[in-house]
Amino acid sequence: MPITQFKNTATLKLEESTPVAVPLGMRVAVASTTSVERDDGVETGVWECTPGRWRRQIVAQEFCHFIQGRCTFTPDDGETLHIEAGDALMSPANSLGIWDIQETVRKTYVLIF
């Protein structure tokens, strides 16, 4: 399996843009992604999201590193995390909750299914 490399992740042009699946409120955030899905249950990429509140529904484990922006994530079973550029997270499988993006965020990520 070849090595996956994303060059200049802070300015990389992202391929796909769609409104978030479950918005909460009138301002609907738009998520943009460039990613590679491998056949071993791993996806990696660069993801960006505009301001807004929405429900996270991804059930995979995720490691991510925030390149820019500011937001909070409130897991269904935990306390609010305040996240900004330079922070990294490792979310266990089934980490459901509410994203609140205050300033457009961009992150690199790895999903493990």
Map each language-model feature to its residues.
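A generic "binding-loop/recognition-motif" signal
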Residues: 50, 79, 95, 104-105
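A short hydrophobic beta-strand segment most commonly corresponding to one strand
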Residues: 90, 97, 103-113
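A short, N-terminal "cap"/entry segment at the start of jelly-roll beta-barrel domains
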Residues: 1-41
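Short histidine-centered beta-strand/loop micro-motifs
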Residues: 45-46, 54-59, 75, 81-82, ...
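Conserved short histidine dyad/triad with adjacent acidic residue
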Residues: 38-58, 92-93
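Conserved hydrophobic/aromatic beta-strand scaffold that supports enzyme active sites
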Residues: 3, 44-46, 63, 88-90
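Short, conserved beta-strand element in jelly-roll/cupin
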Residues: 49, 58-73
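Short acidic-glycine-tyrosine-enriched beta hairpin
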Residues: 78-94
